[in-house]
Regions:
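Conserved active-site segments centered on acidic
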Residues: 177-208
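Active-site-adjacent structural elements in enzyme catalytic cores
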Residues: 1-182
């Protein structure tokens, strides 16, 4: 499927997944019962060294800095759009890893369609190819959407995490930092404008 195979440690009880791949935890449990997962592949850095080969260091990492943007899909798209816009204005060559469902919403940067979220095998198969293409096109920074930590998605996120050196940012944090320079009030009468403005200022949603 484009990613390395699943590695399962059968010397412990319950058996432990050391590297996620096309054979998912659900598939294994249907055959051998309960399996555990090595904590070093659960999406965060650990003080313990990974047991599986090729899992300790940035694996198949692109030359450009790769950042995973995490949140709801809507938040991720909004955040990546904003980040790409800001970096592009600074003359930075931006790469974006998007999907069938989102690529049309990105207006700045070099956008790569990694596949449909409804077909995770396609995403897994395209991941390393897309990273290599960004190398060939000499982008400076890459922003990637995140994927569900279920099924093959866990393997996709594991490889993305390794390639990014565990660099992740919150999409909602980027959205909150968005500055609004103009607010248009629409009202049938002037009596509503004052309370509307006061409520906005009370909530401190605007950065002056």
């Amino acid at each position: 499927i484009g990613l390395e195979s699943t590695i399962l440690d059968m010397t412990v009880s319950p058996p432990m997944i050391l590297r996620p791949g096309a054979i998912t935890a659900d598939m294994l449990e249907e055959v051998i019962g309960v399996v555990s997962v090595d904590e070093t592949i659960l999406g965060s850095e650990s003080s313990q060294a990974p047991k599986a080969p090729g899992m300790k260091y940035r694996h198949y990492a692109p030359k450009a800095k790769l950042t995973i943007v995490e949140g709801s899909l809507k938040e991720e798209v909004f955040a990546i759009r904003q980040l790409a816009y800001e970096k592009s204005r600074q003359g930075v060559q931006v790469g974006i890893i998007g999907t069938n469902e989102t690529v049309e919403f990105y207006t700045h940067g070099l956008v790569k369609n990694i596949g449909s979220r409804e077909n995770e095998k396609t995403i897994a198969r395209n991941l390393y190819r897309v990273l290599r293409e960004f190398d060939d096109e000499k982008v400076d920074i890459i922003y990637s959407e995140s994927f569900a930590m279920q099924g093959i998605g866990s393997a996709i996120m594991n490889r993305l995490e390794k390639a990014a050196g565990h660099l992740r940012i919150s999409a909602s944090a980027v959205v909150k930092q968005q500055r609004y320079r103009r607010v248009i009030f629409v009202s049938n009468t002037d009596s509503y404008i004052g309370p509307m403005a006061a409520e906005l200022l009370r909530n401190k949603e605007l950065e002056q």
